Amino acid sequence: MSSPKPELEFVSTADPACRGSLRDVLLSAMPAKGGLWVPTRIPQVGPDFLERHRHASYADLAEAVIAPYFAEALGPAELRRLCQEAFDFPVPLVRPQGFQGSSSGRIGVLELFHGPSAAFKDFAVRTLVRVTARVLGNDFPQLTVLAATSGDTGAAVTEACAGVPGVRAVVLYPRVGVSAVQESQIARARPGVVALSVDGTFDDCQAMVKRALADESLRRRRPLLTANSINPVRLIAQVPFAFHAKRLVAPGARMGVVVPSGNLGNIGAVQLARRMGLEVAALVAATNVNSPLPELFATGQYRPRRATPTASNAMDIGDPNNLARLLAWREGGPAVSAVTVDDRQTIDAMRRVRAAGGYVLCPHSAVGWKAAEDLLATADGARLDDVVVFGTAHPAKFPDVLQEAFGDARASRFPGQLPAPAPLRIGNDFEAVRRVLESEAGF
């Protein structure tokens, strides 16, 4: 009788001696001596993996991809149940009309926004909440899920946590910079949710979350978990995106992937998929003007910056959390490139794609579309059969940008009315965050 496989461990990118189990990682989102958690080994898929799962549901494909990371901790039956619950919405690859015969006809949009919060982060946050509840729930009757958001993470967190017994979500977001739709999704009144509207930037919110996670006195009161993509569970839950994209293009096609990128978790997940053995011929981080990544790749200099508002607000991040992971998986692995797309180019891409065939991109996906066009104009891009842009959010979440692009804030709409937000307004003040975390608010 064969012995069971050992549970996969995680290691700090900053200290090879710092290791932990999945339970350890959930309880301590950041390693004690800095860095980020990454798996100690990267599982490999066989050459026939995609063919064996070509006609599987997305949930079944995702289960097969993430099983090496979670199955030993959760058990196969529990992992299957988790995937069926968390991934119960469609993930289509859409080719906007009007580009037949041009290089842009090779671009497809992988629509990752058909979950409850209408953004790609539903996949990862729903996974994280379920993994956390099943790994820690018997030992800790009360869990706090803490997140900073520039727009979409917060909505996914509140959707995933609202009404879950023993779980509360505390979400920090910048008072200026999120859209009215995003704020309504994040901060509408409901059980288990505390929304903090911060007089500061997303980077300020993120800094306060990191400070809270490192605060021993807070962590002694009750487990403090992060829903931001510094948590490796979130990133691993996004790895199936690239596998799904690959099976939706023609077998044997040379595929490039363009990822609208802010905190670098999603592009890190694609690079991890490549390290697992998935063939992606080109990978591009499509960023807005706030990202230091293109400069880092071009010059070797990393210069964080204070973010300024752009049309692609969820990517307004000047010091991305997941850089250490991306660099670790890029070193000795397939190449990753990064480009900057400004607001003028973003709005222009939205207009051109809609004018060609009626398809409406969100501003983040439009950043990706422009980067895909630029990739196809290069010598390397000319050899690609397909370029898949990750469609990260539903365009109706950004009525102000739709108004600017089309003169019509209702160019894309959600059904029904969104409720009014009811946040707690605070300054850029960690002590105010501490008071909320120490209270029973939300339970």
Regions found by a protein language model. Give the residues of each.
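PLP-dependent amino-acid enzyme catalytic core
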Residues: S2-F443
